[in-house]
Amino acid sequence: MRKDIHPKNNLVVFKDGSNGAMFLTKSTLNSKETIKYIDGKEYPLVTVEITSKSHPFYTGQQKFVDAAGRIDKFNKRYKKS
C-alpha cells in the first residue's frame, strides 16, 4: 500500500451560522480560522449555513414558504384561453 495518499483527519469545530450551535468532530476540512472550544483547546473553525440544530426536519419547526404569488403568476401566464 502507498503511504501518504489519504487526506489527514483532524478535529474541527463546525459552527451553525444561523443559531451559533457548535459541533466538534473529525474532518478532512481545514480552515485558517480557529476557535477556542468548550474544552479549552483551539480548533479550526468551519462555518456552515444549516445543521441538525437549525434544520426544520430535525427541529420539528416547519416554516411555510409563501409560493402563492408565484403559483398565481404561473397560472395567469399559462392559462388556457
Swiss-Prot record:
Highest rank taxon of the organism: Bacteria
Record keywords: Ribonucleoprotein, Ribosomal protein
GO cellular component: a single term: ribonucleoprotein complex
GO molecular function: structural constituent of ribosome
Classification via PROSITE patterns: RIBOSOMAL_L31
Biological process according to GO: translation
NCBIfam families per record: L31 (TIGR00105), PRK01678.1 (NF002462)
Subunit and interaction comment: Part of the 50S ribosomal subunit.
Family: Belongs to the bacterial ribosomal protein bL31 family. Type B subfamily.
Protein known as: Large ribosomal subunit protein bL31B
